[in-house]
Each structure stands twice: as C-alpha cells, then as structure tokens.
Amino acid sequence: MKVGALVLAAGLVLPATGTLAEDGALTGDQLRKTIVGKTVFLKISGFELPIKYAANGRMSGKMSTVAASLARGDGSSDSGKWWVENDQLCQKWTAWMDGKPYCYKLAQRGQTVHWVRSDGRTGTARIGG
C-alpha cells in the first residue's frame, strides 16, 4: 500500500447528525483562517499525520516511523501546494496521493474538522498550533 493509500484508508465517517452542509461547511475565507500557519493532524488508522499549511500555499507532512512502515510507502514525509477553490481546500502532494490534486469540503466543530473529498471519502482531523 502506498503512503497516499494509507492516508485515505482511514475509513472515518462524518457524524450521524447530518450532512456536511448541515453541519456548516467552511467558506474559502474561513478555510484560510482555520489552516494558515497551523498544523492539521489528520486521523489515520490510529495515528495522526501532521500537515503544516503555510500562508504562501505550501504544505508539508511527516508520518511517524510506525505509520510510514505500515504504509510501506516510499517516504515518510512529503510537501506540496494547497489552495482554496469554490469553498474547498484543494491540495497536491509531490509524491503522496500519486501527486494528484484533490479538493475537500470542511466543517469545523471546536478543534475538530470533518472533511468530505469530492469522490465521497470522509474523515476527521484536529487543528493544532
């Protein structure tokens, strides 16, 4: 399994209380305020993948040694670019996710973010400092 596959294999689900739109999807401006200068900890199969989002549209991620070995990927860290398009967080890693761009709708409850990717995959993350 490649690193990108582990990132998406989390199998996490949105809360049963409603759809992402009902739970208050973030606007483009809200997305920027939520992630710029922050580390977002993506929850993956019992681990957290920290992703840092810089104001210049760059991002970087680093898996723990254990998570990277479980992923059997070709690297435990990667970088890429992010942008906001149509009130979605879009990102493209250099190697992870096969270097393909993906966009996500996000909703936030406190420090928890629920996301839905354009292909329907879902998951959660937490916002750090």
What are these regions (language model features)?
Residues M1-V3:
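Bacterial Sec-dependent N-terminal signal peptides
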Residues A5-P15:
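Bacterial N-terminal signal peptides
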Residues T17-S79, E85-G129:
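Lipid interaction determinants
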